[in-house]
Structure formats: structure tokens, C-alpha cells
Amino acid sequence: MTKENICIVFGGKSAEHEVSILTAQNVLNAIDKDKYHVDIIYITNDGDWRKQNNITAEIISTDELHLENGEALEISQLLKESSSGQPYDAVFPLLHGPNGEDGTIQGLFEVLDVPYVGNGVLSAASSMDKLVMKQLFEHRGLPQLPYISFLRSEYEKYEHNILKLVNDKLNYPVFVKPANLGSSVGISKCNNEAELKEGIKEAFQFDRKLVIEQGVNAREIEVAVLGNDYPEATWPGEVVKDVAFYDYKSKYKDGKVQLQIPADLDEDVQLTLRNMALEAFKATDCSGLVRADFFVTEDNQIYINETNAMPGFTAFSMYPKLWENMGLSYPELITKLIELAKERHQDKQKNKYKID
């Protein structure tokens, strides 16, 4: 059987660099190497692209994926053809955060006309920017908690007015978030104005735009969505925390979370969550994969929190576990995502690019 040629891209110039490497390790160890000839491209923290060809062995440690000593090559040269001498059947970007899941690298793949796994430029960019995402959810009629957003330059000029707006519109606790970052990097839970000021200072280290959201006493529920024009959603899972909130450290370092799959919810609530996840997928014109995150209160009020256009595939990750619960194994999920990438690229070839 002739193998298909796949290139996995990971690392990136982002605060989520190490998360991306951990995700790549998981995918490389799960992908069907009898079916796929796999090359990898590691993007350093400085933005250099380094390639290693024909990965066949198990990746024991993420240290093996820090290709710091390889030759930095031109991007177009790296993606022109695989180490087998044939064009890539698909590129699998496992990049998190800015410069990875925000539409930038998706635009590069579009220009180079290579099939790639996951969301396109528009859906990746709008899912990364929490303010734009919330505005699209609002247009779709999806219920959300109150929030405000502002820029670093606005805060530098109008700090007093912005703090007053937060205190007038929202009730503590509030969550301060960089608008364009994931994996809970830079997020703070604030119980008073002093903590709010510190949270704003922390978040502005990572982005020029912030979103401050109303806190709520609720369960954190997640739904995985898979597909292109006709997506499917899983039954919901729940994040059970042994911490104040689900931050970067608890997600990836401490392991102080448990995933309950499926979530213990009434069937009508589960169905509503699945339908809302599909609506969120459509609201941002997604393709491939999305994880939709919700809050569910004690009286079963549902609020959408966000969509994640490139959910992680680490040992703690909800997305693959939700599909395993639906009968789709991790290797099968990876194969399905590659097939969806090829399907979308084939559909794109139906477009005309010149007028007769």
C-alpha cells in the first residue's frame, strides 16, 4: 500500500510553545504509520522552521522534538514536497495561540495551496479573538455572560473610567483574559479591584486587547465537534477541578483536574449543549474540529464560554477523550481529521479563479 504523505507542524512563536510540542508528541505516537509517511516541522521560539523527515519511532520525550540544531530553511521549500519526493497529501498544524491557530499560518497554507487539518483563515482568526468570537455568538443568539473589552492604549489613557465601568457593569469575581491566547495563559480570577488591576497588568503582557468576563458559579462542560459542512457533536464531558479555576498550571502541569465523560446531566440539557456546540461551529464558519466550552448552572442555565479551534491532544485533553467515548479511537480520529482536510481542499478546487 502506498503511504500518504503528511507533515506535522508544531512549536511556534507563542507562549503556548511547550503545549504545542506536547500535543505533537501525542499525535506522532498515535498516527497510523502504516498508512502515513510522516515528516515534521518544528518552529522555534525565534520563528525558525526546522524539518526532520520520516518519523517512524515512538517519541519518548518532548526533548526529542526540540530541533534546535537543524538548518533553518525557507518555508516554501519545506512544504514543497515530502521526503518521499511527492507532494504532501495534508499538513497537520498543531500550533496553539498567536501565529498558529489565529489564521496566520492557515493563510500561508492557503497561499501555498496545500491541504491542511483544521479551521480556515476566518474561523481560526475569529475563534482566537475572544471579542470577535463573542460578537459572532451574540449575532447567532447564543447566551453568554456579561463582559467588557478594551485595548492596552485605552487603559493607559482611561484607567479610572475603565475600572469604574468594570465595577458598574460586572460583579466580582471576574475573569481577566488576553483576547488572543489560549490554554488559560495570562488569565486571572479577580475578587476585588486590587486583584483586578494586577490581573489587567498580567494579561497585557500577552496581548494588546483584553476581555473581562463576569464570573459564575457553574460547572464547566465541553463538547467536541468534528466535520466540515455537516458536522457532528459528541455527548458533553465535564471538567472537574481541584483548583480555584482551570488555569494553565492545572491544565498541563499539576494534573489537578479530572474529566468526567459523559457529564452527569439531564438528557435534555445534553441535547441542548450538543445543538449549541453545532451552532457555535457554524457561527464562526468552522471546519475540521472545534471544542465548544460552556457553563451550566445549578438550575441548568447554559452559557457558552468559547470555542477552541485547535484543542490540544495531550494526555489531559478532553477533545480526543470525548470522541473515544463515541467509539472513535485516537488514531481513527487523526485519520478522520486528515480525510476532512483533503475533502475541504478538494471542494476548494471547484472554485474558479479566472473569468472566461
From Swiss-Prot:
Its main location: cytoplasm. This is D-alanine--D-alanine ligase. It is found in: Cytoplasm. PROSITE patterns: ATP_GRASP, DALA_DALA_LIGASE_1, DALA_DALA_LIGASE_2. Pathway: Cell wall biogenesis; peptidoglycan biosynthesis. It catalyses: 2 D-alanine + ATP = D-alanyl-D-alanine + ADP + phosphate + H(+). One of its GO terms (molecular function) is ATP binding. One of its GO terms (biological process) is cell wall organization. InterPro entries: ATP-grasp (IPR011761), ATP_grasp_subdomain_1 (IPR013815), D-Ala_lig_Van_CS (IPR000291), D_ala_D_ala (IPR005905), Dala_Dala_lig_C (IPR011095), Dala_Dala_lig_N (IPR011127), PreATP-grasp_dom_sf (IPR016185). Binds 2 magnesium or manganese ions per subunit. Residues 134-339 form the ATP-grasp domain. ATP binds at residues 167-222. Its cofactor is Mg(2+); Mn(2+). Mg(2+) 2 binds at E306, N308. Transmembrane segments: none annotated. Belongs to the D-alanine--D-alanine ligase family. Mg(2+) 1 binds at D293, E306. Pfam families: Dala_Dala_lig_C (PF07478), Dala_Dala_lig_N (PF01820). One of its GO terms (cellular component) is cytosol. Keywords: ATP-binding, Cell shape, Cell wall biogenesis/degradation, Cytoplasm, Ligase, Magnesium, Manganese, Metal-binding, Nucleotide-binding, Peptidoglycan synthesis. Cell wall formation. Its EC number is 6.3.2.4.
